[in-house]
Design a protein with these regions (language model features):
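Short amphipathic alpha-helical heptad-repeat segments
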Residues: 73-89
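Charged, low-complexity interaction regions
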Residues: 88-100
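C-terminal non-catalytic accessory extensions
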Residues: 28, 98-125
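Amphipathic alpha-helical interaction segments
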Residues: 39, 58, 62-63, 84, ...
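An amphipathic, hydrophobic-aromatic interaction surface with interspersed Lys/Arg
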Residues: 12-14
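Short Lys/Arg-rich basic patches
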Residues: 1-9, 18, 47-48, 53-74, ...
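Short, basic amphipathic alpha-helical segments that act as recognition/interaction helices
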Residues: 20-49
Length: 125
């Protein structure tokens, strides 16, 4: 998925990007590629967990500002955890099948969230 984002690049980041000849969007793309619940929870010794940890800390700090159906969140997080546990136990493949199964749960959760938001909008008409 591709999206256009307008961003005010802070001076410190822009300075480093200039020094190292890296475009700011490349930094953000690299960061975005590393945000992954399935990888975060299946590769506990992995070195690319920091982006997801940052995302989790952001959620924790912005808890009052997000509109999350906590019942739906609890249901899908439990399903996600159960799915990962089963897949990790059944397959000795360094979490490959667990990550794929985890992504499927995340996709189902996303569909449920979108359906709930659409229902909310349509019910208001």
């Amino acid at each position: 998925m591709e999206t256009t984002i307008k961003l005010n690049v802070p001076e410190d980041l822009m300075s480093l990007c200039t020094i190292y000849n890296i475009q700011p969007q490349k930094v953000l793309e690299c960061f975005a590629k590393n945000v992954s619940f399935p990888r975060y929870y299946t590769d506990v010794n992995g070195k690319n967990r920091w982006a997801t940890l940052f995302f989790l800390q952001l959620l924790d700090g912005k808890e009052d500002e997000t509109e999350t159906d906590t019942g739906l969140e609890e249901h899908y997080l439990q399903h996600f955890n159960d799915t990962l546990a089963i897949q990790l136990e059944e397959h000795n493949d360094n979490g490959v099948k667990a990550r794929a199964a985890g992504r499927n749960v995340i996709r189902d959760w996303q569909k449920a969230v979108i359906a709930g938001r659409a229902k909310y909008i349509l019910d208001g008409l």
